[in-house]
Amino acid sequence: MFTKIHPTKRKILDKALELFNENGLANVTLRQIALELEISQGNLNYHFKKKEELIEFLYFELFQQGEENEREIRNFTIWDFLQSYIAGMEQLYTYRFLLLDMEQVFREVPSLRDHFISISKFRDEAYTKAYLLGAACGVFKPLKKEELKIWVETIRLLGDSWITHAHRYGITEKAAVFENHLGYFEHWLRNYYMETTKAELNKR
């Protein structure tokens, strides 16, 4: 979907992403993006007629990257799981306006709310698969069906809210945002480790 993007179109997307992240979605116009790039608004409108088109493109670009990251997982150790989770955090942080301004995103492009809800099922299936694989490999404790459902719902909630939670309390620098989330994420996840997993982590 996103191969062979015209260089000017890519520059517009990158600048829009930068401004959306820095200033907030509601505070950025197509005119501002054009001024920052030192191009005419007509040139910008040739590629994106409306702000909604920019938002939609960036939204689906993020989800495409997430799918590619998922396909790259080959094995399952606790290190594989944590590295994959952090890679997902990096991707989300790059497109953080989508989380920080999620309701505004859905107001600007209502169809994205429907898409976001529809993919929740697939996200839950991916989380379930990851946990079951981890349990089969001796990383996680076996869970009953209802316990696994709660685990999946919790990790999805954490994934949707970690950036907004940090910003709400004035934590905005990237390293601090990551440290803030990973601290309580790893503390929560530790409750599901096998003793051998805990011992392996304690060696590091």
Regions found by a protein language model. Give the residues of each.
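Short, hydrophobic secondary-structure boundary micro-motifs
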Residues: 100-102, 115, 143
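Hydrophobic alpha-helical connector segments
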Residues: 70-97
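Short, basic, alpha-helical segments at the C-terminal edge of helix-turn-helix-like DNA-binding modules
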Residues: 60-66
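Secondary-structure edge/capping motif, primarily at the C-terminal ends of alpha-helices
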Residues: 70-73, 99-106, 138, 162-170
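Amphipathic alpha-helical packing segments from all-alpha helical-bundle domains
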Residues: 111-137, 149-164, 183-187
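C-terminal peripheral helix-coil segments that are non-catalytic and often amphipathic
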Residues: 132, 158-204
